[in-house]
Amino acid sequence: MDPCECSKTGTCKCGDSCKCTNCSCTTCKKSCCPCCPSGCTKCASGCVCKGKTCDTSCCQ
């Protein structure tokens, strides 16, 4: 089951800078789509993009 409420088509936009394909929600957990910047550590609670850099502002 996907905890992210979004369709599986379109473009997902996480915050102001993150984008990924195959979903169309405004906030994305890692189970929805890989929105985090490349190399960003995935958080246990799911990753939510909040910026371009891989730091504490990336995940919540």
Curated annotation (Swiss-Prot):
Pfam families linked to this entry: Metallothio
Keyword Translocase: no
Positions annotated to bind a divalent metal cation 5: C33, C35, C36, C49
Keywords linked to the UniProt accession: Metal-binding, Metal-thiolate cluster
Residues that bind a divalent metal cation 7: C49, C54, C58, C59
Function in brief: Metallothioneins have a high content of cysteine residues that bind various heavy metals.
Annotated domain remarks: Class I metallothioneins contain 2 metal-binding domains: four divalent ions are chelated within cluster A of the alpha domain and are coordinated via cysteinyl thiolate bridges to 11 cysteine ligands. Cluster B, the corresponding region within the beta domain, can ligate three divalent ions to 9 cysteines.
Name of this chain's protein: Metallothionein A
Provenance organism: Thermarces cerberus
